[in-house]
């Protein structure tokens, strides 16, 4: 069993070389290294404010789907209703199924 799990990337300590401990006294909290530009071509605008969402993304999607279900459907227009008048539906022929008996 160990040979099957031996090639997994989690056993390779070099996979985690990009992380450094945020606090040397507590090495369990790892934070990734961040990019610090050496030029100002990619600096964000000075008035930019980054905020986090108050609602969790999963809860937000539940609320959005619930609102979509509650939203009233639009009524069919007269133009669409006129097209469907010309359609004829087949009657369920019970006589064809009884003829074989």
From Swiss-Prot:
Polar residues compositional bias, start-end: 15-28
Region (Disordered): 1-48
GO-annotated cellular components: nucleoplasm; nucleus
InterPro entries membership: DDA1-like, DDA1_dom
GO biological-process terms attached to the record: negative regulation of abscisic acid-activated signaling pathway; positive regulation of proteasomal ubiquitin-dependent protein catabolic process
Pfam families reported in the protein's UniProt record: DDA1 (PF10172)
Superkingdom of the organism of origin: Eukaryota
Alphabetical keyword list: Nucleus, Ubl conjugation pathway
Localization, UniProt: Nucleus, Nucleoplasm
Similarity section: Belongs to the DDA1 family.
Function as written in the Swiss-Prot or TrEMBL entry: Involved in ubiquitination and subsequent proteasomal degradation of target proteins. Associates with the CDD complex and mediates the recognition of specific substrates for CUL4-RING E3 ubiquitin ligase (CRL4) by interacting with ubiquitination targets. Binds to the abscisic acid (ABA) receptor PYL8 (required for ABA-mediated responses) and promotes its proteasomal degradation. Acts as a negative regulator of ABA-mediated developmental responses, including inhibition of seed germination, seedling establishment, and root growth.
Subunit annotation: Associates with the CDD complex, formed by COP10, DET1 and DDB1. Interacts directly with DDB1A and DDB1B. Interacts with PYL4, PYL8, and PYL9. Interacts with SGF11.
Descriptive protein name: DET1- and DDB1-associated protein 1
């Amino acid at each position: 069993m160990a040979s099957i799990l031996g090639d997994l990337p989690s056993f390779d300590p070099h996979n985690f070389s990009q992380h450094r401990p945020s606090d040397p006294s507590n090495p369990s909290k790892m934070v990734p290294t961040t990019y610090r530009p050496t030029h100002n071509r990619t600096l964000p605008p000075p008035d930019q404010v980054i905020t986090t969402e108050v609602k969790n993304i999963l809860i937000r999607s539940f609320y959005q789907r619930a609102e979509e279900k509650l939203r009233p459907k639009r009524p069919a227009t007269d133009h669409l209703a006129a097209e469907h008048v010309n359609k004829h539906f087949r009657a369920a022929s019970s006589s064809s199924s009884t003829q074989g008996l």
